[in-house]
Curated annotation (Swiss-Prot):
<dbReference type="GO" id="GO:0043531">
    <property type="term" value="F:ADP binding"/>
</dbReference>
<keyword id="KW-0547">Nucleotide-binding</keyword>
<dbReference type="Pfam" id="PF00006">
    <property type="entry name" value="ATP-synt_ab"/>
</dbReference>
<keyword id="KW-0406">Ion transport</keyword>
<keyword id="KW-0472">Membrane</keyword>
<feature type="binding site">
    <location>
        <begin position="169"/>
        <end position="176"/>
    </location>
    <ligand>
        <name>ATP</name>
    </ligand>
</feature>
<dbReference type="InterPro" id="IPR004100">
    <property type="entry name" value="ATPase_F1/V1/A1_a/bsu_N"/>
</dbReference>
<dbReference type="InterPro" id="IPR027417">
    <property type="entry name" value="P-loop_NTPase"/>
</dbReference>
<protein>
    <recommendedName>
        <fullName>ATP synthase subunit alpha</fullName>
        <ecNumber>7.1.2.2</ecNumber>
    </recommendedName>
</protein>
<keyword id="KW-0067">ATP-binding</keyword>
<keyword id="KW-0139">CF(1)</keyword>
<dbReference type="InterPro" id="IPR000194">
    <property type="entry name" value="ATPase_F1/V1/A1_a/bsu_nucl-bd"/>
</dbReference>
<dbReference type="GO" id="GO:0046933">
    <property type="term" value="F:proton-transporting ATP synthase activity, rotational mechanism"/>
</dbReference>
<dbReference type="GO" id="GO:0005524">
    <property type="term" value="F:ATP binding"/>
</dbReference>
<dbReference type="Pfam" id="PF02874">
    <property type="entry name" value="ATP-synt_ab_N"/>
</dbReference>
<comment type="function">
    <text>Produces ATP from ADP in the presence of a proton gradient across the membrane. The alpha chain is a regulatory subunit.</text>
</comment>
<keyword id="KW-1278">Translocase</keyword>
Amino acid sequence: MAINAQEISALIKKQIENFQPNFDVTETGVVTYIGDGIARARGLDNAMSGELLEFSNGVFGMAQNLESNDVGIIILGDFYTIREGDEVKRTGKIMEVPVGEALIGRVVNPLGQPIDGLGDIKTTATRPVEAPAPGVMQRKSVSEPLQTGLKAVDALVPIGRGQRELIIGDRQTGKTSVAIDAILNQKGQDVICIYVAIGQKESTVRTQVESLRKHGALDYTIVVTASASQPSPLLYIAPYAGVAMAEEFMYNGKHVLIVYDDLSKQAVAYRELSLLLRRPPGREAYPGDVFYLHSRLLERSAKLSDDLGGGSITALPIIQTQAGDISAYIATNVISITDGQIFLQENLFNSGIRPAIDAGSSVSRVGGSAQIKAMKKVAGTLRLDLASYRELEAFTQFGSDLDAATQAKLNRGRRTVEVLKQPLHKPLPVEKQVLILYALTHGFLDSVPVDQILDFEEALYDYFDSHHEDIFETIRSTKDLPEEAVLNEAIQAFKDQSEYK
């Protein structure tokens, strides 16, 4: 058999031309230490800060400390199956979470994976967990109210869309209840809500989710949870994952309300990670950048300019204090970043004043400009009246004789405190809040016994619902009060036909 050299040569040339090198270049390193949610790896010389790294068991980590001889990694998942000597490789990506409408109504972990047993989340859109906050020219001043449905908040410390309002207080003072009520009140307001539970007991989160479901609020709410049993890296990352989901809606011109419950636990988780990564401790053993931890998170809440669609993220961060000390390190940090705070006091809570808002220490730095005209008119002097009542109340404990004017102030003050009380999970529409506050400030409640104020309030709403729905409609549509004579006549007519004469 004759061998044709030219044919063989042509065949070899063809094979060389068609040769496809089938190999993948990845930079890999070796795990040198593993434990407590962090790892150290050698050999990842070109890793970037915040880059996602993949371990041989499929779990991801995030590069945090870039040192001369190794890389400190926080592990975003189960670290129990990782061993010293395992391979870890660079991905060239930063951490992203799934975002979009498909997440609404779901309970997810900080990685965006569903944990509610309702199947996969069908979305292809993702956003980076760490993103720059909108710049000065991309923002617009807060001008629209975000009604919480709580009389004490909407009248005394109003919140506007795009504001950051801190809820601060000791444990068991109703901080979460204020935030959940604010979420419940967004029903039908075209606001998407995100509740981020950080370091909570799983039973507590379950209770909150059931409460949201029962009131129909899950239809517009996403729950992101990193429970107390999860590793610190997930607690640290949870708020950033929540705000990344919120940004998707904000940049599409929608309004979002996000609750961080609570940032004290996130700071503790970050302290734990930093100490394990051998970063130098500062005050109370927190790392030096603990202020930046919260400032870069809360600065991502904004009211966008009209050019960018006018969307907004309103943030309600929660901080837990000890023995009412609002001058603690993390508390003062977050107070200085936010646009005001709602301070809840244990002694008010225990004496039955709920929500237990301390009007003297609570403030809203920007929300006043977002209040509707009607609320501004009826709540204008409320804060001062309440403050002078507290002062007089302390003074009267000495038992001195009081003149008629002082007695009248005390009587009005007691009724004000009573009117600002509200049952749990029963937010009020703004027109009803305006009505009862108008009745209070114009003396219609002065003759009603203090212990009957709440009954009077319910009866007044029922009467106006059936006889004067037009007045409610006027407040809703014009955002202003109807003529005083009309309102006075309607309230007086109710009093005349009721037992509260």
